[in-house]
Amino acid sequence: MSYTLQRPGEDISVEEHMARTSLFARLEDLVAWSRKNSLWPFNFGLSCCYVEQVTALTSVYDQARFGAEVIRASPRQADLLVVSGTVFHKMAAPLLRLYEQMRAPRWVISMGACANSGGMYDIYSVVQGVDSFLPVDVYIPGCPPRPEAVLDALIMLQQQVGSEHRPLGVTVGNSAGLGFDAPRRRDQRRDERMAQTLLDPPEKL
């Protein structure tokens, strides 16, 4: 789009006016752009990782730059679930219920070693990774991760959301509406990751 100056009272053609004031794009691209730049998070904080997550909201880190500063009080208003901390088996069912109440399309960020893999708590009462019952889109490693890692994960999720083309509504079948969930990138690369035998050292991450 080019910008030009115009004097008051100067007449221009309709075609030139349309070229200056209109933007043409596919509807799917506009919807993906708006979803990417206005993620509405619902935070599910259980332990020390949540303190670092809330620190990312402060003016020092300014999460508002990425359009995800408004934390929703209800899962029905959110499209991003951020799970941070140790998830016990008692909390798995309420967490799954909160996820199911979110409106599609929805995304999940797992924050910290405890949410990713159970952390140091290899015991009967701790869920060994929230991806055992939730489709996680982005993992944030660390114990606890720094606020910069939270912002980096948010940028990664925005890039993923901007490249996805999900339906605008609900697909209606013969008698009931069926929700839509896109295949997760984690699932698409599962075989490749399972075949890896050499891991990068922490300095390269």
Curated annotation (Swiss-Prot):
- What reaction does this catalyse? a quinone + NADH + 5 H(+)(in) = a quinol + NAD(+) + 4 H(+)(out)
Location relative to the cell: Cell inner membrane
Name the source's superkingdom: Bacteria
Identify the stretch(es) annotated as Disordered: 175-205
Q: Which cofactor does it need?
A: [4Fe-4S] cluster
Cellular compartments per GO CC: plasma membrane; respiratory chain complex I
Q: How does it sit in the membrane?
A: Peripheral membrane protein
Which terms are listed as keywords in the entry? 4Fe-4S, Cell inner membrane, Cell membrane, Iron, Iron-sulfur, Membrane, Metal-binding, NAD, Quinone, Translocase, Transport, Ubiquinone
Q: What class of enzyme is it?
A: translocase
- Which biological process, per GO, is one annotated for this protein? aerobic respiration
According to its UniProt record, the EC number is 7.1.1.-
Q: Cell membrane: present as a keyword of the record?
A: yes
On cofactor binding, the record's note says: Binds 1 [4Fe-4S] cluster.
Q: Which residues bind [4Fe-4S] cluster?
A: 48-49, 114, 143
Q: Which GO terms describe its molecular function?
A: 4 iron, 4 sulfur cluster binding; iron ion binding; NADH dehydrogenase (ubiquinone) activity; NADH:ubiquinone reductase (non-electrogenic) activity; quinone binding
Which Gene3D superfamilies does the UniProt record give? 3.40.50.12280
What does the record note on quaternary structure? NDH-1 is composed of 14 different subunits. Subunits NuoB, C, D, E, F, and G constitute the peripheral sector of the complex.
Q: Tell me its family.
A: Belongs to the complex I 20 kDa subunit family.
What the protein does comes down to:
NDH-1 shuttles electrons from NADH, via FMN and iron-sulfur (Fe-S) centers, to quinones in the respiratory chain. The immediate electron acceptor for the enzyme in this species is believed to be ubiquinone. Couples the redox reaction to proton translocation (for every two electrons transferred, four hydrogen ions are translocated across the cytoplasmic membrane), and thus conserves the redox energy in a proton gradient.
Please identify the protein, giving its name as recorded.
NADH-quinone oxidoreductase subunit B 2
Q: Which organism is it from?
A: Rhodopseudomonas palustris (strain BisB18)
List the taxonomic lineage.
Bacteria, Pseudomonadati, Pseudomonadota, Alphaproteobacteria, Hyphomicrobiales
| This protein's encoding gene | nuoB2
